[in-house]
Every structure is written in structure tokens, then in C-alpha cells.
């Protein structure tokens, strides 16, 4: 059955640009876009329902392509410590940081993790997010990584959203492997990843390449295992120092490399050549009060596609609004509103390998879109906070909050 959505203007975000269609209409059939264009060119047809969008601006549904939305506890006390001058690295070295979340996550049941995550993700959904990536990485052993990945799959069943799962077992060194990082990486590669993949719980594999996490050589071992399992890879790279992680990611044709504050021009060129998306995470940059900016001009100059994401996590980016990240991306990183919106639509889709089906409004793509009561799409980036009036459509069906 075909449904007509009419009386609107559309920012399709094709090719990373607004690509406006004014005085437009959309026809959906099932979960797909059947037709899109000028309302005066609408083909004669019979529709099961006609929806008047009252002159709204329609954008693709937002895609949050880098989150750690499933976790136990929170780290508000560490937030206070950082404001007293304690660094992220110092907190991690004293057993805080990721380690404290690992303890809380291991202690939590699947049901507890699911219920707490749903509260957070519903906030994102009400902000216009229709697709979300969620990483494991707070279990750090087979049993608890599996628990997290099972919860991620359940979120996809519970909510009207597209949910992609990423195994981030190589996030930090668990306490039982203290001073045995090579042995832990071997355990990930020979035991955890093959089993978790065999259970159908993994869509992609990620790792944290940093002095306080894993070396490029160790990450490469994980990447080779992922490659052998036909799983795409992603990487946390160059957040706190320059280790060449983004070039390593490019070598393995990673979907994305994320953070990237300390990447070099050679890293940028490598990512441009491989088509790897640069995912910028302004929430973590802001909360950690960083001063080293990602090389935005170089990324743009070399044609690297830039995505933005919330990096929702309990330690460095407890961000429940992707729209706020849009404003931060523009204010902190000097992205234009158009570039920022591309970063949570088509470029974010590319960072998840979903660009053929998601991220822009085109015939044949999934009917995920948001109708905003605004005068121009730049307003979505411009306004700070609040709940902009909107209608969210997921797979051709309006989501009722």
C-alpha cells in the first residue's frame, strides 16, 4: 500500500549536500521510498493514506554511527575529578575510566542493561535518530561481551530503529589480563570473535589504538581476524596521540576511523585513498576540554567524508542529543550546517556501510525521515537544546512517542 506525504520541502542530502526539492512530496510503499520529487510532478495513483506535512522541511533520519549506549552505572564522579584537574589518562591508570564501567557492566544483568540503554536511546530517537550503532567493549570477556551484544540485538527488536552492533572487545585490558595485552588480543582473536560472530551477534569489529589501550600491531592482529570472518572494521584512532592508527585503518579499508585529533596529513591521504570515513566526536572533545583539533581543512581538501556522532558513553561523552553534536561540530570544528547534516546522514551511513539503503532521501532507499517545523535546514544545527517540533518516520511508519 502506498502512502503519500505531501506539502513539504526536502533536503535529500544526496552527495553530502542539501540537494533541495521545494514544494515536494514523498510516496512510500512499505518500508521504502517509492517516489520523491516536486508535488506538481506527482504521478497519478491511489494512496492508502495522505499525510499533510504542513510545509515542514524533511531530512533523512539521523544516523548516530558511533555510540557506547549499553553500559552499567555512570561516571559522574569522574566528571567532577576531571574538573579538579585530574586527566583522563590518570583516572584510567587508577582503576577508573573504562575499568569502572567494566565492573558495573559485568555486575548488571541483561535486563538491567537493556532497560537503562532503552532510556538513553529513546532520548536519541526523539531527537530524530532512526539508525544507531552500538559497541560492546565494557565486558572484556566472552560472557560479558556476549551479554552486551545480545542486549544490542534486543534493542533492535524493541525499538523502531535500525541498530548495528560492533564488537569492541579490544577496548581496554581487563583486570584478569593485567600486563598481558598480547595474550588478551590472542584470546579475542582465537576465542571471542569467532564465537560471537558464529552466534550472529556482530556486524563490525572495532578497537582502541592508543598508548593506554592497544598498539597498532595488536590492532592489526584483530583486523586480520575480522577480515578472515568477513567482518568490516572500524577504529578509535589518534584521539590522544599520533600512532598511525588511522593509516592502519585505511590499509584495511575500514568503514571509519574515529576521533582523529592527532592524525597527520599522511593519515588523511591514506584515508582519502581507501574511502575510509572520518568520524568526528565533538562531545568527547568538549567534555575532555581538548585543545588539539582534528585537521578539518586537510580532511576536506583531500576529499575525506566527515561524519559526526554522539560517542554516547558514560565517561567522556554522556551525550543524549545528536542535534547538540551538530551544533558542536559547527561551533567547535567549523563545519557548515550543510556539512554537519551530511555528517549525521549520508556520511554516517557510509561509516556503517549502509549508504546504499540509508542516509539520503532517494527512490528505492529506506523511508526513514524527519519532518521539521522550521524555515530552513540550517536551523536544525543552529538551535541549542530544546525539542524542535518534528515528526519522525521510520520505515514508512510515523513513530509515536
Swiss-Prot record:
One GO cellular component term noted in the UniProt record for this chain: cytoplasm
Reactions catalysed: 4-imidazolone-5-propanoate + H2O = N-formimidoyl-L-glutamate
NCBIfam families: hutI
Protein name (Swiss-Prot/TrEMBL): Imidazolonepropionase
EC top class, as a word: hydrolase
Cofactor dependency: Zn(2+); Fe(3+)
Main location: cytoplasm
SUPFAM superfamilies noted in UniProt: Composite domain of metallo-dependent hydrolases (SSF51338), Metallo-dependent hydrolases (SSF51556)
Annotated compartments: Cytoplasm
Amino acid at each position: 500500500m502506498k502512502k503519500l506525504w505531501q506539502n513539504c520541502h526536502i533536503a535529500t542530502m544526496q552527495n553530502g549536500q542539501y540537494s533541495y526539492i521545494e514544494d515536494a512530496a514523498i510516496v512510500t510503499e512499505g518500508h521504502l521510498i517509492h517516489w520523491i520529487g516536486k508535488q506538481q510532478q506527482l504521478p497519478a495513483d491511489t494512496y492508502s493514506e495522505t499525510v499533510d506535512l504542513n510545509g515542514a522541511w524533511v531530512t533523512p533520519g539521523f544516523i548516530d554511527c558511533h555510540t557506547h549506549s549499553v553500559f552499567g552505572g555512570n561516571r559522574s564522579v569522574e566528571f567532577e575529578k576531571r574538573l579538579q584537574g585530574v586527566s583522563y589518562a590518570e583516572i584510567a591508570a587508577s582503576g577508573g575510566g573504562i575499568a569502572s564501567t567494566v565492573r558495573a557492566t559485568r555486575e548488571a544483568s541483561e535486563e538491567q542493561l537493556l532497560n537503562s540503554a532503552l532510556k538513553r536511546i529513546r532520548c536519541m530517537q526523539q531527537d530524530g535518530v532512526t539508525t544507531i550503532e552500538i559497541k560492546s567493549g565494557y565486558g572484556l570477556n566472552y560472557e560479558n561481551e556476549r551479554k552486551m551484544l545480545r542486549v544490542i540485538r534486543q534493542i533492535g527488536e524493541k525499538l523502531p530503529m535500525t541498530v548495528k552492533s560492533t564488537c569492541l572487545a579490544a577496548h581496554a585490558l581487563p583486570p584478569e589480563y593485567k600486563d598481558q595485552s598480547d595474550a588478551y588480543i590472542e584470546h579475542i582473536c582465537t576465542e571471542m570473535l569467532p564465537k560471537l560472530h558464529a552466534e550472529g551477534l556482530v556486524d563490525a569489529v572495532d578497537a582502541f589504538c592508543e598508548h593506554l589501550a592497544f598498539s597498532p600491531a595488536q590492532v592489526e592482529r584483530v583486523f586480520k581476524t575480522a577480515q578472515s570472518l568477513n567482518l568490516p572494521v572500524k577504529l578509535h584512532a589518534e584521539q590522544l596521540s599520533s600512532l598511525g592508527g588511522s593509516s592502519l585503518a585505511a590499509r584495511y579499508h575500514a568503514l571509519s576511523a574515529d576521533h582523529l585529533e592527532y592524525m597527520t596529513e599522511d593519515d588523511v591521504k591514506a584515508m582519502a585513498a581507501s574511502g575510509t570515513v572520518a568520524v568526528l566526536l565533538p562531545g568527547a572533545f568538549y567534555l575532555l576540554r581538548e585543545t588539539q583539533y582534528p585537521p578539518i581543512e586537510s580532511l576536506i581538501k583531500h576529499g575525506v567524508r566527515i561524519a559526526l556522532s554522539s560517542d554516547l558513553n558514560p565517561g567522556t561523552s554522556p551525550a543524549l542529543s545528536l542535534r547538540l553534536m551538530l551544533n558542536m561540530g559547527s561551533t567547535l570544528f567549523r563545519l557548515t550546517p550543510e556539512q554537519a547534516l551530511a555528517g549525521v546522514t549520508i556520511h554516517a551511513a557510509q561509516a556503517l556501510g549502509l549508504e546504499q539503503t540509508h542516509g539520503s532521501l532517494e527512490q528505492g532507499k529506506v523511508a526513514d525521515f524527519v519532518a521539521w517545523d522550521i524555515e530552513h535546514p540550517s536551523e536544525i544545527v543552529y538551535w541549542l537544546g530544546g525539542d524542535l517540533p518534528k515528526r519522525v518516520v521510520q520505515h514508512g511508519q510515523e513513530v509515536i512517542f
